UniProtKB/Swiss-Prot annotation:
Top-level taxon in the UniProt lineage: Viruses
Disulfide bonds: none
GO cellular component: virion component
Protein name: Transcript termination protein A18
Subunit text: Interacts with G2. Might be part of a transcription complex composed at least of G2, A18, and H5.
GO molecular function: ATP binding; DNA binding; helicase activity; hydrolase activity
Length: 493
């Protein structure tokens, strides 16, 4: 551990690295506090901060020669086969680590690789290459299966622990598997942190962007007080502030043959209201809507918009244009609404729900991977990051208030490389609730812009349903407003 005074140069380096964000670290008293320049406190500077050679230091760090936590079940013939770009990542990692060892720097690397790159299989290859006992830490149990599959393919002895770190510690007294796959809440147990710090050399933090290391979390404390010998952060959307804990980054661009289209489903709605809607509208400008909770609640009861989403999905699915669909909402009640209506239309053999409150959901996800046609309805929280269904070909985004990191992760669910190349996303920028009309339009525009500018999607307008739906007849004034609405939306984009 490095307890240092917060001198100007150190503070400036940290501030630059975090893009000017507030910096919080543990001080010499063990308090997690905001760092101020010229503070009289000494601060615990994370080991991974020094992994970059651009950070000047006289500190000397331990190397792998000081430990003997080697994998016993390694079999070189079981190493996974990698694509050329994945092999390039491995080559970069090995080259960087040689330099780190030579310079006596911490062996900490962030693998910033696009969604669908194959971070899991690439990291398993590196794990087998290093031959060191490994802890794989995931943010939720839904990610366990994809790691289990790849670790088993490499032939490594492993143990999975989802519930009850105390029972795991008892088992570890008699056996110490080569690979531990655990959920991050295990790191709240100090005895477990001490154990893996002593008996395991490599720590892999999957989906590292899901942790804000500027908060006093279990992962933050573990990396500060029980830093592993080697560490990988895996992410497609890194948090700038997390670089303080893992300051060496490898980012190799991925070229894709996927044909990616984002359909903007424009529609003009007559104003819609109910007593419930009028009650929630009163809360839009209050503190209870700070995180747009009521904005999303209003969307969930926007019946005309919900019906448009259903009509579009049903039309596309029945036509065979799309076959393996992910429907994403922000709120659980919104998810349940779509699930029940789709279940009535297509039945339980086709429609599935990704419910965080159902313990059987991970098993259900495994079972639908082999299906040719299905509709999977879930929430952004549960399926927005790390959902492992590579065959997904389409995504319906029913919510609107999503930050850039979540957008990129969500769109990545349909950007996995498979033999089928067409990928389609549907967004719905309109609402029948006039009080949130422009707000929703702006939020959805952010999704469209990021998908086109950063992720290579092609934007298209979708009007099949509105043009063919006999219920869409309207008065001349309504038609005029519809035209003006479309012009406004197109100019906005």
């Amino acid at each position: 551990m490095s307890l240092l005074k917060m001198e100007y140069n150190l503070y400036a380096e940290l501030k630059k690295m975090t893009c000017g964000q507030t910096i919080s670290l543990f001080n010499e008293d063990g308090d997690f506090v905001e760092v101020e320049p010229g503070s009289s406190f000494k601060f615990l500077i994370p080991k991974g901060f020094y992994s970059s050679p651009s950070v000047k230091t006289s500190l000397v760090f331990e190397t792998l020669t000081t430990t003997d936590n080697k994998i016993t079940s390694i079999n070189p013939t079981n190493a996974p086969k990698l694509y050329p770009l994945q092999r390039k990542v491995v080559s970069e990692v090995v080259s960087n680590m040689r330099k780190m060892i030579e310079l006596k720097r911490p062996l900490y690397i962030t693998l910033h690789l696009a969604c669908g790159f194959g971070k899991t299989i690439t990291t398993c290859y590196l794990m087998a290459t290093h031959g060191r006992k490994t802890v794989i830490c995931v943010p939720n149990k839904m990610l366990i299966h994809q790691w289990k599959t790849q670790v088993e393919a490499v032939g490594l002895e492993h143990k999975i622990s989802i519930d009850g770190v105390s029972s795991l510690l008892k088992e570890l007294k008699t056996q110490s598997p080569d690979v531990l796959i655990v959920v991050s809440r295990h790191l709240t147990n100090d005895a477990f942190c001490k154990y893996i710090n002593k008996h395991y050399d490599l720590f892999i933090l999957d989906e590292s962007h899901t942790y804000n290391l500027m908060n006093n979390t279990a992962v933050t404390r573990f990396l500060a007080y029980y830093p592993p010998m080697m560490c990988y952060f895996l992410t497609a959307t890194p948090r700038p502030a997390n670089r303080i804990y893992c300051n060496s980054i490898i980012n190799i661009a991925k070229l894709s043959d996927l044909k990616k289209t984002i359909y903007v489903v424009d529609s003009f709605f007559e104003p819609y209201s109910t007593d419930n809607i009028r009650h929630m509208i009163k809360r839009l400008d209050g503190p209870s809507n700070k995180y747009h909770i009521y904005t999303e609640k209003l969307l969930s009861v926007d019946e005309p918009r919900n019906q448009l989403i259903l009509n579009t999905l049903v039309e596309e699915f029945k036509s065979g244009t799309i076959n393996r669909i992910l429907v994403i909402t922000k709120l659980r009640e919104h998810m349940v609404l779509f699930y029940k209506r789709l279940l009535d239309l297509f039945g339980p053999e086709v429609v599935f729900i990704g419910d965080a409150q159902n313990r059987r959901t991970p098993d259900m996800v495994k079972s639908i991977k082999e299906l040719n046609r299905f509709i999977f309805v879930s929430t952004l929280f549960y399926s927005g990051t790390g959902l492992d269904i590579p065959s997904l070909d389409s995504l319906f985004i029913c919510s609107a208030v999503i930050n850039n990191m979540q957008i990129e992760q969500l769109l990545g669910r349909v950007c996995r490389e498979t033999e089928l190349l067409d990928r389609t996303v549907y967004v719905f920028p309109n609402t029948s609730i006039k009080e949130i009309k422009y707000m929703i339009g702006n939020f959805v525009q952010r999704i469209i812009s990021l998908s086109v500018d950063k992720l290579g999607f092609k934007q298209e307008s979708y009007r099949k349903h509105q043009e063919s739906d006999p219920t869409s007849a309207c008065t001349a004034s309504s038609r005029e407003e519809r035209v003006l609405n479309r012009i406004f939306n197109s100019q906005n984009r």
